[in-house]
Every structure is written in C-alpha cells, then in structure tokens.
C-alpha cells in the first residue's frame, strides 16, 4: 500500500519546502511556504483484474497537493511550478518500499485557487500515483 505519510516524505525530499512545512491532513495554523498532501477522492473504479483483487498487479493513489506559499503571487506561482516541474520530469521512483510505475498529472499546470483568509496565495496540483501492489 502507498501511504500518505510516504508521499509526504517524497514531496519533502523534493526540497521545495522545508520538511516541517510539508504536512498531511488539516492544519489549523498553516505556515507560509508549506505544502499539504491530501487524498483526492476523484471518481474512479477500483483496479480489479480477472480473478479478483489479489490478481491485480497495481493500484492507484489519487493525491491533491496544496501549495500554500506567501502574499506574493509571483513567488507563489514559481514555487508551485517548481514542484510541478519536478513531478513532471520524474524518471524513476520508489516511495518508501513501493515501486511507482508512473504518475499522471491531472492538471496541465498548477491551478491558482486564490488566497486564503490571510491573503496567502494557494495553488493545487492533482495527480495519480500508479504503483505496484506488493501482494503477500
């Protein structure tokens, strides 16, 4: 299984934001220059091979990344684009002990979702991680 905590560590290792500024779940007091990693519940059927779930060799983890940066739109856009570019140019990937077959970016560029109530610019990147299932 590909866990959110492992994806959070992968995003942290990309060095766009400091490690303690990359989080999963909701934080009441988001720090500037942070990235949130959330499950993205977009519609998709489960991966099911003929013969049942145990015959499926891969699965999909849908993720939404929230880039919560600062009050400068240019700097915020630049940080979001830097993250997007690193994801787009990934050539080989293991997250934790899980081999990633490929990832699909679901948006053509980071999506500007405006500012939060404190005027901090935010961008969203939605993507799917296709990973090899490690069957016991």
Annotated model-derived regions:
Residues 69-92:
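Mid-chain, well-packed structural core segment of small domains
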Residues 1-54, 90, 94:
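Small/polar-rich, solvent-exposed N-terminal microdomains that initiate assembly or binding
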Residues 20-27, 66, 81-85:
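Generic detector of contiguous secondary-structure segments
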Residues 135-136:
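Compositionally biased, intrinsically disordered low-complexity segments enriched in polar/Pro/Gly
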Residues 88-130:
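Acidic-leaning, charged glycine-interspersed low-complexity segments
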């Amino acid at each position: 299984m590909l866990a959110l905590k492992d994806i959070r560590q992968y995003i942290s290792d990309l060095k766009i934001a400091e490690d303690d500024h990359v989080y999963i779940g909701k934080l009441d007091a988001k720090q500037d220059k942070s990235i949130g990693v959330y499950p993205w519940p977009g519609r998709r059927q489960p991966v099911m091979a003929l013969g049942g779930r145990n015959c499926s060799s891969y699965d999909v983890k849908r993720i939404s990344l929230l880039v919560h940066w600062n009050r400068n739109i240019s700097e915020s856009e630049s940080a979001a684009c830097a993250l997007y570019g690193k994801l787009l140019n990934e050539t080989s990937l293991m997250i934790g002990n899980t081999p990633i077959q490929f990832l699909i970016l679901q948006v053509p560029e980071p999506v500007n979702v405006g500012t939060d109530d404190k005027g901090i610019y935010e961008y969203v990147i939605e993507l799917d991680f296709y990973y090899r299932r490690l069957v016991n």
